Amino acid sequence: MPATPQLQLICTDFDGTLHSDFTEPAVPIALQVKLSEVKAAGTQWVINTGRTLEDLQYGLDKANLSVHPDYVVVVEREIYRYEGDEFIPHNEWNERCAAAQAALFAHISDRLPEVFEWVNLHFTASVYEDQWSPFCLIAGNNPDADEIQKYVEKKFADEPLLSFVRNDVYARLSHAEYTKGTALKEVARLLNIPCEGILTAGDHWNDISMLQPECAQWVVAPANAIPEVAQYVRSINGFIAPSDCGLGVLEGLEWALNDI
């Protein structure tokens, strides 16, 4: 008979999943206590976010957590190990990722001015370049973001390695092989943890790559997850929590622990 699965790794999105800007505390105390308990029993925890490392550090400091992650994934792809008060980069992965991104972005660079021009002509939106992507978007609203996404994806339909990574009205172009899902798989590889020992929790489009059965045994969406994520999680027999954000993650953790 197969061995009983054990919860070895918890992977949570940050904004809208672990953390809420609209509650005090931003991460429920009960969830912090539960994370401390499972970590004390040997389970590891990774925060997997679209935030930059600097923005995540700010959010963690402001939340004043009593428990800390073992790893973080930032800008949906860069991996850092948290040790003491330092974030230690996983250089092999991060450098390989940066090289792949740079090559892809150089390949499409001459096509981007037309995209910027089209967005600025048709929408009130912020489009800009930063060190992680040559095309970043803050749309005025979600319907505008929908239209911009359709245009960009059609424009680059001949570039299968290019992905439009979106969270609400925020988006960036990225390399399709470096996602929250592939970064989670790399963390699991480093820790020698099979997908059968992993729980993932997320609420938005950019979380779907890590909410795959090939990534995790237990897949959780809080009650505030967007309809597309909730529908997907339901379709794979994952757990739709009754509560929003961190309380929903806590409910998902209890669901997984009761399954063991």
How does the language model describe each region?
Residues 111-199, 205-214:
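Conserved acidic, metal-coordinating active-site core of Asp-based
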Residues 9, 71, 197-199:
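Structural motif
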Residues 3-24, 211:
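Asp-based phosphoryl-transfer active-site loop
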Residues 83-92, 179-180, 255-260:
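Short, surface-exposed amphipathic charged segments that create phosphate/polyanion-binding patches used
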Residues 39-40, 157, 234:
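Anion (oxyanion) recognition and catalysis
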